[in-house]
């Protein structure tokens, strides 16, 4: 998953007027188009403004296969999201982590080798539902219960991938899912993506690839970073299954994120001696 900071930042000023409480405070329920514009505005705000940051990441992953010993791993890490300059004078968001421990023991290496891994959510997960992605998605707004105005709006989506649009699409595999949106801020509270035929492992000249069903969820919560307020992942879950019956293999990944901090760049001037 790749962030596209440079492409979307231009629309920030135009769309901000439709974001936040403006939509939620109106007399009528916003249309699907208005909700997508609000999501796009918040996405642009995130892309243009989220600073380099770090937080605590506590992740558990497992692989369960019939006839094999279960493989479980727990990692405790410092997760980092760094805003990195590019040659074309734009910036991109790059994920990394410093692993502190594996299964409760101090880490002797920094390679996170599974059994289940996930990356890219911080870089571009919010792009799944946006005006920009209408060329790649079919969106529909779930019926809103007007007696419960504080309940999240729910937007359903399904990919429409073609040879012509695939290069512009955030999701590169046929998928469907739901986005739960806070009415007061037009921020994403929860994202769910189901990919029925996810490529788990690429094939080769000697073996076919491993394909399975992947179910992914991301919960978001507001975080104050310096003077800015951003909705960041608080929990990420993934479950992938391959095979059927007694031959079913299950991979799972679950991570929680806490204690967000903005990266501070400090400098110190050393005065030379006369």
Name each model feature, range by range.
Residues 1-11:
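Bacterial N-terminal signal peptides that target proteins for export
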Residues 19-21:
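N-terminal signal peptide c-region/cleavage motif recognized by signal peptidases
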Residues 25-176, 183-189, 194-274:
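Structured extracytoplasmic
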